[in-house]
Swiss-Prot record:
It holds the Pfam family Ribosomal_L9_C. Keywords: Ribonucleoprotein, Ribosomal protein, RNA-binding, rRNA-binding. It comes from Staphylococcus haemolyticus (strain JCSC1435). GO terms for cellular component: ribonucleoprotein complex; ribosome. Belongs to the bacterial ribosomal protein bL9 family. The gene is rplI. Binds to the 23S rRNA. GO terms for molecular function: rRNA binding; structural constituent of ribosome. One of its GO terms (biological process) is translation. Signal peptide: none annotated. Coiled coil: none annotated. This is Large ribosomal subunit protein bL9.
Length: 148
């Protein structure tokens, strides 16, 4: 019997997959527990529509990420930090501080965990910080570190 999985079933199939399974297993376990539905023409059409909708949503996410990337390339974020003698920073500028400055200065909200800055910024001046906006889209934020 052909079924369409509505949820992931370990060792059998993933959500949205169409598979041929034994009739008893399909009726007594998969369909009964709402893990799958029978692969009728109506259900197949519904699955196709869901896949198209999901693809359109995914494309919209990618387009939004690309728009944000182009916006980030045009702006500059200014972060102030305490410095000692010789222009050395006390501590470092973290991704949290950059995210907060981006939110207050340009009203753009980006999760600090999406920024790739493992060591932080330890010097005054300009730094390009890579940001993972989406699985496929990566941008950079230009950060200007100034004295407090």
């Amino acid at each position: 019997m052909k079924v369409i999985f509505t949820q992931d079933v370990k060792g059998k199939g993933k959500k949205g997959e169409i598979k041929d399974v034994p009739v008893g297993y399909a009726n007594n376990f998969l369909i009964k527990n709402n893990y799958a539905v029978e692969a009728t023409p109506g259900n197949l059409k519904q699955l196709e529509q869901q896949n198209k909708r999901a693809e359109a949503d995914r494309q919209k996410e990618i387009d939004d990420a690309k728009a944000l990337k182009s916006k980030l390339e045009e702006i500059e974020v200014e972060v102030s930090a305490k410095t000692g003698e010789g222009g050395k920073l006390f501590g470092s500028v973290s991704t949290k501080q950059i995210a907060e400055a981006l939110k207050t200065q340009h009203d753009i909200k980006i999760d600090k965990r999406k920024m790739d800055l493992p060591q932080g910024i330890h010097a005054l001046g300009y730094t390009n910080v890579p940001v993972k906006l989406d699985k496929e889209v990566e941008g950079t934020i230009r950060v200007h570190t100034v004295e407090k």
